[in-house]
Amino acid sequence: MGETIIEKIIRHNTGKAVKPGDIVTVNVDRCMIHDIFIPFVADKFEEMGFTKLHDPDKVVLIYDHLVPASQQDDTRHFHKGDEFVEKYGLTHVHRSAGICHQLMTEAGYVKPGDIAFGTDSHTTTYGCVGAFSSGIGYTEMASILGTGTMWIKVPETIKVVIDGELPENVMSKDIILRLIGDLRADGATYRALEFSGSTIENMSVASRMTMANMAIEAGAKCALFTPDEKTAEYCEIELNDYQKSLVGDEDAVYMKTMTYKAENFVPVMACPSQVDKIRNVSELEGTEIDQVFIGSCTNGRLEDLRAAAEVLKGKKVADFVKLIVTPASRKIYRQALADGTLDILAEAGAIITHPGCGLCCGRTGGILSDGERVVATNNRNFLGRMGTSKVEIYLASPRTAAACAVAGKIVNPE
């Protein structure tokens, strides 16, 4: 019988063939902790009685949610993290380089076929390069730090096939939002999403990253893309035989298969305050807005900033609308600075901020008040995420968000 991608990864890791529902213990190739959770992980690690890390080289600590500190208590997280680094000999530490999920692939920490866990729900992002990655809590992370292993239940797989050429103003964000709307917020709970088709093959790794990042919004345990030459170039590696084998077999057993024609996708938005509340942008046109946010681990990459700049070039952000742009990493910031992208955005009236999570998690500037509306490119629009519980958050692609910033209201990108 054939295997899905997730089944191949687990078999390679454990040396045993598996099927959905099996409980197995895997060897963890890489784990990530960010600044929000490091105090809790550190305390739980010592509470469990561990005195040393199983393998310090497999641990990555990234400060991103709270950088730079906007509240007095934020510095406690940094101090706790630095103490942990010094005490246990961590060498992979990033204090201001960008968002954790961007850095994990950008810096080469996760490779195709790896198994990785992180203390953040959007750890599913690394599936963009063909890795099995998922978010966990601080207790599980503390256990991994001490043992190097983690138990998992082998998930069923939902196959998503997308063929054809996308319309000009449609981005991968529109695809994943539509998929979440079709599946609903719990439609893929503890299941793997496996993406294939000509549309996926033609996508950049950055676009795949957007889709893998948001898989959790349908409840998915992970999202997986077959590694290809684009993956190899991005990861700066030559794919080995194992990595080349990470494609779903024709006779693999899937929970179900969802098929789409790329030409049928249109710009969409997730409406307040549910990520699966999806409507076409055309249905929302004319809705006035107060702010636009372009950034996050979902859409803060160079191609996202360039897409926004293409829309904004020669135009101005509407009066009384604030446009905040936050690159996902320092590397992306410098690339966008070097190629003139940031200059176009700044000339249009954008506020360019330091790399990091920024407004996505409601920190370090840009929060809104009662009755205000924001169009944002991040991954969640829950109540209170960007200010008070009476703020309305609409999730969209960078092209759509940029068009809305110019119009001062929700419009289709042109």
Question: PLM ranges: what are they?
Answer:
Residues M1-E414:
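Fe-S-dependent hydro-lyases/dehydratases of central metabolism
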